[in-house]
Amino acid sequence: HKLKSKKAYGSGYHRLEDEVTGIDDYSGMRGGRFQVYLEEGVRKGISWQLQDGCDYHGTTPNNKTVNDEDENGNTLGSVTTKTRNYDHFVKVVPFWQLSLWTEECEKAPGAWGNLIHSYRTNFNASTFNTAGKQQIEMMKRFMDGCGIDLCDFFEKAGLLRPIHAYIEDYSPGWNVITQAMCDELKTYAASKGYPKAPAALNYINAYNCENFRNEVHLAEGTVGNGCTLQSNKVK
């Protein structure tokens, strides 16, 4: 869709940016899931699939005994691990941001189509036989599809971070990504010579995307000025 369309999206309500929701210090705030994503992923550095959110917030993890796996899907023996569900809509935020930047800002039109086409024409499921390998491969293919180095963006979003966790999603299973896998993707992107995405891309949303489209430079401020601390929140 286009942001200024008044058809499918009415007068321009965007759920991730406009819904009043959130947790903890961000509870009851407009765009609460965006706030959660920035706090959990960008600031705290929590892996993408383990970022807490409004749905399932406060859920007590369950102890589950399963066969452990390594990054290649090899069974390592029985382990008891903690597992619980996390907010699925918080996971959507970085992909919405990529849609805004590539399509709405017209920085890489067709990037998603290129990604999908690459899977249709060349994908070996036996090679990418684990969730971790598939996650890394998705990021690689997306960067190839748009010709841009998005490693810093993916890392801040929590996608390009080591993880070894049993994920309770629509179906349960291990997601294992090692530091070596992350480093390999970074080396690949650097070898392609792709230009880097803007450092602040993790902050793009439906209401500031024109600044990213026009590459507006922010005026330098003075440290300590422009914000005030109110009840443990910076405003």
Spans of features found by a protein language model:
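Active-site recognition of the HExxH zinc-binding catalytic motif
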Residues: 1-6
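Short, glycine/acidic-rich hinge or "gate" loops at secondary-structure transitions
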Residues: 9-18
